[in-house]
Amino acid sequence: PAGSTFGEYPLEVNTGNLNPDYKTVLVLKLKSSSPGSTIGAQYDTLKITFVGCLSLLDGNYSVAITSAGLTAVRTNEVVTLTDINTFRTRYVGRYTLGTFSPAGYTFIDICDEISLPKNQTLGGYSNKVYGTSFYGDGIDGIVTSETTFEVVHNIAFADGDQKQTYLYTRL
């Protein structure tokens, strides 16, 4: 219907032959079947990611956070599982605990490729926290071993966005 921002489409996928160790992406290009109706450009591509690998990144870490040429090391970082393969950190940027509420930032790990969901802000402020695709298209971080992972994202400020680089090491 006019003005709608979503629609329904039944889709059955037999996942039996998908690789359980790597993500499989199904890309659908949407077109209207009703005369006179259109699909906005921002909605014309639908990506569905099938994941066989469950992420185990939740836990306690030491993290080195670098931005604006300075590095802060936090030895009490806690990465919390909030949903399937979705996590929330305790720290964002080099800021101390309690600076923002909610604290930290959210990321998703799909088969050792980390991405930041859109529309994150710095605590209750309007500053956007967003991915940079530093490691490839849509990839804002990588899991480098069973005990380490890296993330790069930006925080938007009025005087210019600031790159944040994190190196997490499991304790």
What annotation goes with each model-predicted range?
Residues 51-171:
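Ser/Thr/Gly/Pro-rich, low-complexity flexible regions
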Residues 1-6:
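Short proline/glycine- and polar residue-rich coil/turn motifs
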Residues 33-44:
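Beta-sandwich strand segments
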Residues 47-49:
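Extracellular cadherin-type adhesion modules in metazoan precursor proteins
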Residues 7-32:
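Contiguous beta-strand segments of beta-sheet-rich domains
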